Structure formats: structure tokens, C-alpha cells
Amino acid sequence: MLNEDVMVNAITGSTGAGVKPGATSHFSWRNNNMSIYKPFSHQHVPEIKQSLKQLQNSFDSEIDFIPYRGDFPRGIFATLVVKCKVELEELVKMYTDYYAEDSFVHIIDKNIDLKQVVNTNKCLIHLEKHGDKLLIISCIDNC
């Protein structure tokens, strides 16, 4: 099903930087600011590729991952874009079936935002089709 390159953009709050404080993790630097870090070479790219291969053994396309530092303390807001010929209804059913036993993952039929997940264990996922492109949006509170 996934036979095309995957583009992932993810914006993380300051808590996504881990427990080790750094110059870019402080409010005074992040306030009213946004920046890219480790584009195309982030340490999580191999993990993302491994997860996709576990779901679809034939997956061997590129993963272009662009992480951003956001102007908020908690959460990760991520988008993924890939060419996909499968109809939206079938994709929503696949996602709903896959996460049916996971009480914290919710497939949502309208747009999502971080305020819906901050201070919760929830992961929200929203799917949209635009022509032959699939847009997957997800958000979590990463604390």
C-alpha cells in the first residue's frame, strides 16, 4: 500500500527535548519562536522506517522527516503526506480496526489540535484525502 516516499513534519513542544536542558529548551528562547532541527537526519528516522516495515514488509521508500521546535510546552503535532490510491473510507476503516483495542488512540473525522490532548493520554489521528494524496494528522501530549 505504501510504495511512495513519505513526508513527515512534526512540531514538538519544549518537553519533547527530553530531560537534559539546553539553550533551545527554555521558554525565553522558544517564546514567539519556531525552528527546524536535524532535518532529514533526525535520530528517529530509522525507528519510523522500522515501524513502517513491520506494518508493511515491502515498504522501502524514503522517509523525509522534518522536526520543528514549537512555541508551546507540551505536545507533538505531526503531519504525514504520502501518495495513496486507497479511498478515504477504506483507510479510516483500516485505522479504526487497527486501533480498536487501544483505548487511548482515537480516529477523528474532523480536524484536530493540541488542546484536545494536553494533559491526557490520548493520541488523536485524523485522515484526509486530497486527490491522490493522503494527509495523516496526529497529536499527543508527550509528557
Language-model segment annotations:
Residues 1:
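Short alpha-helices
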Residues 143:
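A conserved FAD-binding loop/helix module that cradles the flavin
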